[in-house]
Amino acid sequence: MKLYHGSNVPVNVPDLKHSKPYKDFGRGFYLSADRKQAVGMGEQKLSQIKQGSVYVSTFLFDESVMTSGELKVKIFDDYSEEWVNFIIANRSYDRKQPVHDYDIVYGPIADDGVTYQLRRYEGGVISLERLLTELRYPKGITFQYFFGTERALKCLKRI
């Protein structure tokens, strides 16, 4: 399958040293199966950095790796209490990072709207049930792939 990475620079060889901590699934290389979503991520990066251009780098990924047992993989098929706790742990500046040892994680993106809702939940403003209800918006869920180890990155082939 093709996976896409949006940024303000082209990425020919992904490496973890350019990855920032405290992201949804931790420090890693993030991709999407949706090219349009990757373009949006590139636009977002460009607006933050204010230099470069929008680039979408394309990679081939043999998705059988997700179930082969070769790598440690975590899959979140939907928003759930486990997903909420995983995102909160990875984004927490108060916890020792990394908080997990997965090679690859697949699951919903916590975009800006989700981040706001997570803060409300953490602050006790809304319950977990209310949070999960609010996360299910009409546009549907957007998913991301996280590659967090060198072993995982070796599964990506730039095209």
Name each model feature, range by range.
Residues 1-29, 36-47, 82:
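Glycine-rich loop/turn
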Residues 1-5, 29-30, 56-58, 144-146:
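Ordered hydrophobic segments in well-structured contexts
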Residues 23-24, 40, 44-159:
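Conserved NAD+-utilizing ADP-ribose enzyme module
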